[in-house]
C-alpha cells in the first residue's frame, strides 16, 4: 500500500497546507519513505513583512542600551518566510545552533525571545499565572475559543479545569476505548482496504484527522460526525479557523479587532462563517443533550459515573448539575473539539510516518500488538502491556512534539535563569522541538527504543 503523509508542523497556529511524503512498498508488509521535508522546491508561501520593517522593529524595540544579555538573531526575509509559512520548528532549530539556547527574533512588527533551554522553560512555565500569561495565543484565538479553557487565564481556567477533569475517569476511558476508539479505528481500516488492494496513495494526515474528529464527536458529544465516509463541513470550518488564527499572529496590524473591517474583508468573513458553523454544531448538541437529561431527571450518584446510553463528557457535565452558562459550556467543549482532534491526529501521523521509515521497529510493534491482543479488539487495560508501541509513540512525541512551540507573555519584568532580562509585555516562544533535539541534552535517541 502507498501512503501519502502530511508532515508539516501540525501546530494549532500552522498555515494548513500539507507537505506530502509518499511511501512505496518495496516488499510486502514494510514501507519505505521519501521525505519532502528536504525538498527545497516544495516551500510554502506566506505573506511576511520586508527586511526593512524587521530591522526597524529590532532597532525600536531594543535600542542601543539593551542590557538583556539575549543575543539577536539576524533573520533575512527568506528566513522569516520559512518561519511563518513553513514548518515552524526548522528555522528556530537553525537559529538555536547559531545563537545558543536563548535568542531574540524580530519578525516584522513583533519580536520574540526564543527559549531552547530546559531551565528557562521551566521557569517561565512554573510562573504561569504569576509572571506569565498566554498572551499572543489568547489574542489571536479568542474569536474561535471564546472563554474556553484552551485560552482561559487565572481563576476562570482553574474553575473550568476542575469542572471538566472529573469526567475523564478510568471507567469513562475504558468504556470509550471499547465503544468508540475501537469501532472508529475499524471503520478506518475498512475504508483503507480498497486503496491497499489497488496500491493507491493515501493522505494519512487527512484520514487521521477524520478519524480523530469522529472519536471526539462520540466521546465528547455522543455525536457521530461520520467524517471518514462523508464530507464534513465541520472539518473545513476547523481548518479555516485555525488558518485564520495563524494569519493573525503575523499580521502587521491587528485590524481584525475592528468590527467594521471584519464585516467587509473577505478573509474575516470566511473565518466568521467557519466559527459560526462550529459553534452552531456544538450548541445544537448541547441543547439536545440538555433536553434528554432534564426529561430523565439524571444526576451523578457516584464518583466514576458513566451513562450507559450516552457515556460522553457532555452528558457527565450536564448530569453534574454545575451552575455554568450555555456559552461557557459551549466554549469549553469547543476547545476539546478543535484542539483535541488536531493534536491527536498529529501524534498518529508522525508515529506512522516514523514507523514506516523503520521496518524493524514496525515489525516489532506489529508483533507486540499480535501477541498482546491475539486478534481481539484492544481494551484500556491492554495499554500497560503494549510497552514497545507506547515507547514508539513517546519517541514520536519527542522527535515531533505537538505543539512544537509554546507561547507565553511576560506580565512583569523578570530575570530568567542565566541572568537574561525580559521586559513586561515580552512574547516568549518556548521551542519544545529544540529542547528535545539539543545535542547538549541527555535525551533518548530514536535508536534507543530497545531500552
Question: Which sequence ranges carry the predicted segments?
Answer:
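Cytochrome P450 heme-binding Cys-pocket and its upstream "meander" loop
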Residues: 87-94, 320-331, 435-451
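Cytochrome P450 core scaffold surrounding the K-helix E-X-X-R motif
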Residues: 121-126, 225-226, 360, 435-447
Amino acid at each position: 500500500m502507498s501512503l501519502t503523509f502530511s508532515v508539516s508542523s501540525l501546530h494549532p497556529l500552522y498555515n494548513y497546507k500539507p507537505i506530502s511524503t509518499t511511501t512505496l512498498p518495496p516488499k510486502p508488509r514494510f514501507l519505505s519513505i521519501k521525505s519532502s521535508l528536504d525538498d527545497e522546491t516544495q516551500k510554502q508561501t506566506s505573506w511576511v513583512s520586508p527586511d526593512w520593517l524587521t530591522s526597524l522593529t529590532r532597532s525600536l524595540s531594543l535600542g542601543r542600551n539593551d542590557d538583556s544579555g539575549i543575543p539577536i538573531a539576524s533573520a533575512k526575509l527568506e528566513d522569516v518566510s520559512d518561519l511563518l509559512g513553513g514548518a515552524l520548528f526548522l528555522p528556530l532549530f537553525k537559529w538555536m545552533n547559531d545563537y545558543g539556547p536563548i535568542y531574540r527574533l524580530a519578525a516584522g512588527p513583533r519580536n520574540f525571545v526564543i527559549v531552547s533551554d530546559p531551565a528557562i522553560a521551566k521557569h517561565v512555565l512554573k510562573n504561569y499565572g504569576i509572571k506569565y500569561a498566554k498572551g499572543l495565543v489568547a489574542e489571536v484565538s479568542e474569536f474561535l475559543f471564546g472563554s474556553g479553557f484552551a485560552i482561559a487565564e487565572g481563576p476562570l481556567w482553574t474553575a473550568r479545569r476542575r469542572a471538566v477533569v472529573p469526567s475523564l475517569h478510568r471507567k469513562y476511558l475504558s468504556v470509550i476505548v471499547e465503544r468508540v476508539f475501537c469501532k472508529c479505528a475499524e471503520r478506518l481500516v475498512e475504508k483503507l482496504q480498497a486503496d491497499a488492494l489497488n496500491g493507491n496513495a493515501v493522505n494519512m494526515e487527512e484520514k487521521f484527522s477524520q478519524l480523530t474528529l469522529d472519536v471526539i464527536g462520540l466521546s465528547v458529544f455522543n455525536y457521530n460526525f461520520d467524517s471518514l465516509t462523508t464530507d464534513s463541513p465541520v472539518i473545513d470550518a476547523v481548518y479555516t479557523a485555525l488558518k485564520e488564527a495563524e494569519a493573525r499572529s503575523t499580521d502587521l496590524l491587528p485590524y481584525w479587532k475592528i468590527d467594521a473591517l471584519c464585516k467587509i474583508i473577505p478573509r474575516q468573513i470566511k473565518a466568521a462563517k467557519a466559527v459560526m458553523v462550529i459553534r452552531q454544531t456544538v450548541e445544537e448538541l448541547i441543547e439536545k443533550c440538555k433536553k434528554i437529561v432534564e426529561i430523565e431527571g439524571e444526576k451523578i450518584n457516584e464518583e466514576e459515573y458513566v451513562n450507559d446510553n450516552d457515556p460522553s463528557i457532555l452528558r457527565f457535565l450536564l448530569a453534574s448539575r454545575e451552575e455554568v452558562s450555555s456559552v461557557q459550556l459551549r466554549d469549553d467543549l469547543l476547545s476539546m473539539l478543535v484542539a483535541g482532534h488536531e493534536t491527536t491526529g498529529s501524534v498518529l501521523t508522525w508515529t506512522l510516518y516514523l514507523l514506516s521509515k523503520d521496518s524493524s521497529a514496525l515489525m516489532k510493534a506489529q508483533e507486540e500488538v499480535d501477541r498482546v491482543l491475539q486478534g481481539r479488539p484492544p481494551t484500556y487495560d491492554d495499554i500497560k502491556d503494549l510497552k514497545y508501541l507506547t515507547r514508539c509513540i513517546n519517541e514520536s512525541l519527542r522527535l515531533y512534539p505537538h505543539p512544537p512551540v509554546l507561547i507565553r507573555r511576560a506580565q512583569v519584568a523578570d530575570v530568567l535563569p542565566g541572568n537574561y532580562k525580559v521586559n513586561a509585555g515580552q512574547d516568549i516562544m518556548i521551542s519544545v522541538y529544540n529542547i528535545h533535539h539539543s545535542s547538549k541534552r541527555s535525551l533518548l535517541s530514536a535508536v534507543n527504543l530497545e531500552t
